[in-house]
Amino acid sequence: MTTAPIDNIRNFSIVAHIDHGKSTLADRLIQITGGMTDREMAGKEQVLDSMDIERERGITIKAQTVRLNYHAKDGKDYIFNLMDTPGHVDFAYEVSRSLAACEGSLLVVDASQGVEAQTLANVYHALDAGHEIVPVLNKVDLPAAEPEMIKQQIEDVIGLDASDAVMISAKTGFGVPEVLEAIVTRLPPPKGDRTASLKALLVDSWYDVYLGVVVLVRVVDGVMKKGQRIRMMGTNAAYDLERVGYFTPKMTAVDELGPGEIGFITAAIKEVADTRVGDTITDDRKPITEMLPGFKPAIPVVFCGLFPVDADDFETLRAAMGKLRLNDASFSFEMETSAALGFGFRCGFLGLLHLEIIQERLSREFDLDLIATAPSVIYKMKLNDGSEIEIHNPVDMPDVVRIQEIDEPWIEATILTPDEYLGSVLKLCQDRRGNQKELTYVGARAMVKYDLPLNEVVFDFYDRLKSVSKGYASFDYHLTDYKPADLVKMQILVNAEPVDALSMLVHRTRAEGRGRAMVEKMKELIPPHMFVIPIQAAIGGKIIARETVRALRKDVTAKCYGGDVTRKRKLLEKQKEGKKKLRQFGKVDIPQEAFIAALKVDS
C-alpha cells in the first residue's frame, strides 16, 4: 500500500447513540472500499466489534480502527482512517482520546428515533476536539423514518446545520457512496511535520497472546520506524519498536508511519497498565518537552465486591480477573474477605455499564457464578482531627463520633424522553434527591438536566428510568463535584449478627424505606430454622426495621396419651430451653438468592 501525501489522508470517527447503526455503517464503508472482500464479509456483521458481548449488546467497548483506500471522483487516491469509538458514557475518556486522533466526525442519527442523550454527549466531545461534523441520517428506508423532522431536531438540539445531511441505509448500502465523497470534500486533512521530532498520541492498547501489548497510535509529527527507541512520557518508560503497521481490518506490517497516520506498534510491552490511554510517545534520542494536552489516568468511579458462589472457584476468579486486567487497565481489584460470603475481591469500575460488562464476561468467558455486593462510590470524609480520608467500602467507615462531615460525588444528568413520560421521569429524579437545572422541549420530546447524587444513580436508576419511560428515555451523565451529605451506615442484622455484605451508606431520609424493603425481602427467602430468627435493619444502635422468621414447630407432646398436664409442660419447657440454646449458638444459613434479592430491592 502506498503512503499518500498528508493532504490525501482523512482521519474520522463515527459518533452515534447505541443501536443507531454505527458499526453497520463501518461494515459498509469497509466493504465498498475493498477493505474486506464480499466473501470475507459474508455472514459477519460488526467487523470491528471483536468481543461477543460487543456484538450481542450492539455496543462498542474498545476503540477500534481500520485503514481504507478510496479512489475519489476527483481522480485522486485517498487514505481513510476510521476510528470506531465506544458510544457509552462509562467509556467517555476513551471516546475523547479517539476523537483527539481525528479531525472530523460522521454524526449518525437514526431517522426513526432522532437525537438521543449519548449522541449529544459525544457530539460535544467531538466539538471540543475541534471536529468538522457531517450529519448522516441512517435507516431512512424504515416506514417510521421522518428525515425532515430529524434534520430540524439536529439543528434545534445540537445547533448543527443539517440541511445537507447525507441520507443512507447502512443495512442495504443505499447512500453510502455519498458518505465517502462527503468525507473527501467536507472533512479537513491532518496537519503534521515529517521532519520534526516524533510526537504521537497513544489512543488505545490491548493484550495479544503472541505479540504482548499492541498499542494503537496516531502520529502527529515525525515518523515511527521499526527498530526505533521510543519513550512514553506519562510513565517515562522506553521501548524498542518491533512492529509498525495498520489495520485493514487485518493487521498489516509496514516500515514506517508518517504524520497524520493512525496505526499500531508493538514493543515487547508486558502489561496494558504500562500503556496509558492519552499518553504521548516520543523518540528517546530526540525527545520533545511538552506532552499532548488532555491526558488523565483512568480513575474508577463505582466499586463493588465480587464473590464466587462456590468457594472453590476463588483461584479461578483471581486468574480470570488478572486476564481481564491485561486488556482493561481501568478495571482494578483487591482481595477482601466477608464473614458472610467468604473470600472475594473489591473491584473498581468506570461506571455501571463497565461493571455489568466485567461481570458478564466473568460469567460467560470463565464460567463463574458470582455474587455482587451493593455498588458504592467514593466518599470523602473529614475527621475531627483535621485529616481527610476516602472510602468506597461501607465496612471501612470510621466510628460516627470521629466524623465531622461526609461528602458524596454528584453528577449532572441529561435525560431525553418523549413528553408523555416526563412526569414519571421527573418524579424518579426527585425521589433520588435530584435538583432540576433545566427543562427544554424539542418537538414532542423533553430534555431535562438534573443534578443527582451518584450514590442514588449507581444502584438501579438506569433500570428504573427505562421502566418508567417504557424504554424510550435515554440518559447520559458526567461527574461534577463533591457536596456534603447526611449519610448513615445501615447494617442488616440476622439473628443479632451483622451481615457485612449487606451494609451500605444511605441518605438518612431514605434509610428506613430501604431497610424495611430489605428485611421484608430477606424474611421471604431465609428458610425457617428450629429457632426464631429476627432480621433487623439498624443505624448504629438504633433498629429502624424488623421482621421475624418463625421457628419450625416440632410437636414434642405427640407421644403423651393422656396423663398429667405437668408431663406435657415438662416436655415443652425442655424444648423451649433447647431452642434458647440453639438461638444462642445456632448458625443461620442465608441462601445466596436472599443476598441477591436483598441487594436488588427497590425502596
From Swiss-Prot:
GO molecular function annotation: GTP binding; GTPase activity; guanosine tetraphosphate binding; ribosome binding; translation elongation factor activity
Top-level class of the enzyme under EC nomenclature: hydrolase
Binding site for GTP: D19, H20, G21, K22, S23, T24, N138, K139, V140, D141
Superkingdom of origin organism: Bacteria
Key words, A-Z: Cell inner membrane, Cell membrane, GTP-binding, Hydrolase, Membrane, Nucleotide-binding, Protein biosynthesis
Domain tr-type G as annotated: residue spans: 7-191
InterPro entries: EF-4 (IPR006297), EFG_III/V (IPR035647), EFG_V-like (IPR000640), EFTu-like_2 (IPR004161), G_TR_CS (IPR031157), LepA_C_sf (IPR038363), LepA_CTD (IPR013842), LepA_IV (IPR035654)
Cellular component aspect of the GO annotation: plasma membrane
Keyword Electron transport attributed: no
Catalytic activity: GTP + H2O = GDP + phosphate + H(+)
Membrane topology, record value: Peripheral membrane protein
CDD domains in alphabetical order: EF4_III, LepA, lepA_C
GO biological process: positive regulation of translation
Location relative to the cell: Cell inner membrane
EC code: 3.6.5.n1
Family stated for the protein in its record: Belongs to the TRAFAC class translation factor GTPase superfamily. Classic translation factor GTPase family. LepA subfamily.
NCBIfam families reported for this sequence: lepA, small_GTP
Described purpose of this protein according to its UniProt entry: Required for accurate and efficient protein synthesis under certain stress conditions. May act as a fidelity factor of the translation reaction, by catalyzing a one-codon backward translocation of tRNAs on improperly translocated ribosomes. Back-translocation proceeds from a post-translocation (POST) complex to a pre-translocation (PRE) complex, thus giving elongation factor G a second chance to translocate the tRNAs correctly. Binds to ribosomes in a GTP-dependent manner.
Protein name as catalogued: Elongation factor 4
UniProt source species: Rhodopseudomonas palustris (strain BisA53)
Lineage: Bacteria, Pseudomonadati, Pseudomonadota, Alphaproteobacteria, Hyphomicrobiales
